[in-house]
Each structure stands twice: as structure tokens, then as C-alpha cells.
Amino acid sequence: MELMAKPTFSIEVSQYGTTDLPATEKASSSSSSFETTNEEGVEESGLSRIWSGQTADYSSDSSSIGTPGDSEEDEEESENENDDVSSKELGLRGLASMSSLEDSLPSKRGLSNHYKGKSKSFGNLGEIGSVKEVAKQENPLNKRRRLQICNKLARKSFYSWQNPKSMPLLPVNEDEDDDDEDDDEEDLKSGFDENKSSSDEEGVKKVVVRKGSFKNRAYKSRSCFALSDLIEEEDDDDDQ
């Protein structure tokens, strides 16, 4: 009988077959063996599996990519809200006392009273188109009342006003003037009577009349004239 020698690779296979191979090597060996048996069918199935896995991975990645973005936006919004809240708290802590101080300032109170009801308040100056928009329209009733008050005050001040530069008016003593005029008339009458009675005493009475006229003229101002002065001057002219 003839003995057939066994190939050497069979022994190696038996030796390596006893050892446990890792899962990755088993998968690679199985895939390679599967590809050798049926090249066309195996390659198509393997590619289909690979592409399906990749698409699954990509789909999972895409789904996972959308969620982290949303979470990041939510986190940013929450951080902004927290920052706003913290800034408001800090502002309230720091400026709560300042608001009362600003209200108590006399300058601010004076300005608020001065511009109260006269101008509009704009939060943004860019909203103002022209200067006319700043002025606030006045109520016609208030305007009429204000004008009436101004007219009353103007009338009172006009009648009660005195010019300090002008000299005060001196009172005129009318009684003294009347007495002087009476004396002049008596002197004239006595002079006429004496002229009729005697011619010697005529010159003396004329001198008395002239002295009286000069006396009255000394007391009276040059700017004031009376009818008695004209009569005296006419009499003097007639006598001369």
C-alpha cells in the first residue's frame, strides 16, 4: 500500500486552530473567506453593509450635531439672562441710593419745575425730526389766563412806578398867592383913592405899588404868570 504524505499547511492549521483568535481577526478572516468563496456577491453585500453603517453613523451624527447646537444656544441664552439679572441686581444695589440723592438735588428740582409742561420727553434724541417737535403745544385756556395775569401786573407796575431820576413836584401854596393878590388889589384901590384925594400923595403910592409888585415877583418863579401880573404891568405903563 502506498502512503500519501499530508501537506505541511494542514499541521499549521491544526496548531493555530487550537488558539483563540480575537474578535476582530475572526471577523476579518470570515469576511476574507466569504469574499473568496463568492467574490461578486460578497463584495456587494460588504459594500452595502459598509455604506449602510456609514449612513447610520452619519444619520446619528447629524442628529447628534443638531442637538448640541440647540443646547449651546440655550446655554448662551441662559447665560445672557443670568448676566442681565446679575447686572440689574448690581444696578439696583448701587443706584438705588443715588436716585434719591439726585431727586434731592436743588438743580434737578429747579430744572424739572422750569421745563414742566413746556417740552416733550424723548427717550432717544434721534427720534426728533425738528426743533418744533420739542416745544409742547400750550393749552389756549392756560395761555389766556397767563396773558391776563401779565396785563394786570403790567398795569399795576405802570401806575405805581416812579422815576427816581425825576425831581419831586413841590406843592404850591395857593393860600399865600391869594393873600398876595388881595394885598395887591388893596394897594391898587388905596392908590387910586389917594390919587383922587390929593396929587401930592400920588407919587408915594406909586412907589408902594411898585415895591409890592417887585415883592410878589421875587416869591414867584419866572415860569409861572398870573393875570394880576399883566394887570399890574398895564397899570404901570398907563401911569408912565
From Swiss-Prot:
Residues 202-229 are annotated as: Kinase-inducible domain (KID). A motif (Nuclear localization signal) lies at residues 142-150. Residues 70-84, 173-187 have a biased composition (Acidic residues). It is found in: Nucleus. One of its GO terms (cellular component) is nucleus. Keywords: Activator, Nucleus, Phosphoprotein, Stress response, Transcription, Transcription regulation. Its main location: nucleus. The modification Phosphoserine is found at residue 213. The record marks 213 as: Critical for interaction with HDA19. Residues 1-128, 163-207 are annotated as: Disordered. Residues 188-205 have a biased composition (Basic and acidic residues). One of its GO terms (biological process) is response to cadmium ion. The keyword tRNA processing does not apply. Residues 51-66 have a biased composition (Polar residues). Interacts with HDA19; Ser-213 is critical for this interaction. Transcription activator which may regulates gene expression through interaction with the histone deacetylase HDA19. Promotes slightly the tolerance to cadmium (Cd) and to oxidizing chemicals (e.g. diamide and tert-butyl hydroperoxide (t-BOOH)). The kinase-inducible domain (KID, 202-229) is required for interaction with HDA19. This is Protein OXIDATIVE STRESS 3 LIKE 4. It comes from Arabidopsis thaliana.
